[in-house]
């Protein structure tokens, strides 16, 4: 089983794409894979904390999404967690205190949630805030942004408090790796990609 934490930015991006009547955007594909219940044959358990769901709710309400739609979105996420292979409940996956290694408290809370849920993968478009002195960073790919500029992507591997490791990946790499049936694991990443030296 793979425990995956989708960051709020991925979910918000998916909702923006839905609202704009787009289809097959990266964020939409990410959510579709998570909802499917399996990734390359492995069962998937979505994990989010109550605080993450509250933040998601606040962002959507601030963006003037109808309250009924917002509650529908939150309820759907809770159901996906509860009916996943591990049957997570966001009230149980508390996440604890934000990880002090991160400057941003919200990102620290997301990382703490991933640790508390024993997640193997965290998907975020906000990689730079999860990299740091105590993390390994690997160059993974280049993508073209909507403005035409090329963006170099990387992933981050962090040691969890339980001695296992967490892969923090950009949504575009997540989809590319699933499409190629690349195993999303620290070992596979270390073998396939070049490490970025720490400053």
Where are the predicted features?
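Active-site neighborhoods of divalent-metal-dependent phosphate/nucleic-acid chemistry enzymes
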Residues: 82-121, 132-138, 195-199
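Short catalytic/ligand-binding loop motif for oxyanion handling, primarily in non-cytosolic enzymes
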Residues: 13-14, 55-57, 130-133
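Acidic, PIN/NYN-like endoribonuclease modules and their adjacent C-terminal/linker elements
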Residues: 127-199
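Short beta-strand and adjacent tight-turn residues that come in two discontinuous sequence segments
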Residues: 124
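PIN-domain endoribonuclease scaffold, especially VapC-family toxins
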Residues: 38-42, 47-93, 179-180, 191-199
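Short, well-structured N-terminal submotif of metal-dependent ribonuclease cores
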Residues: 1-48
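Well-ordered, non-membrane alpha-helical segments in soluble/globular domains
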Residues: 23-31, 70-71, 147-150
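Alpha-helix capping/helix-boundary segments
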Residues: 10, 52, 110, 128-129, ...
């Amino acid at each position: 089983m793979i425990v995956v934490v989708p960051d709020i930015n991925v979910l918000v991006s998916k909702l923006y794409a839905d609202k704009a009547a787009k289809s097959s955007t990266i964020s939409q594909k990410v959510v579709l894979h998570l909802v499917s219940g399996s990734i390359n044959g492995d069962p998937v358990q979505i994990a989010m904390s109550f605080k993450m769901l509250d933040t998601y709710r606040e962002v959507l309400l601030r963006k003037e999404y109808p309250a009924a739609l917002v509650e529908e979105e939150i309820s759907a996420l809770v159901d996906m967690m509860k009916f996943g292979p591990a049957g997570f409940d966001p009230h149980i996956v508390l996440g604890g205190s934000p990880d002090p290694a991160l400057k941003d408290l919200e990102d620290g809370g997301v990382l703490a949630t991933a640790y508390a849920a024993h997640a193997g993968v965290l998907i975020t478009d906000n990689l730079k805030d999860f990299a740091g002195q105590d993390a390994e960073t690997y160059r993974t790919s280049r993508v073209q942004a909507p403005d035409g500029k090329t963006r170099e992507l990387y992933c981050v591997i962090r040691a969890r408090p339980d001695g296992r490791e967490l892969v923090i990946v950009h949504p575009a790499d997540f989809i590319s790796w699933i499409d190629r049936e690349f195993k999303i694991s620290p070992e596979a990443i270390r073998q396939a990609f070049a490490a970025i030296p720490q400053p």
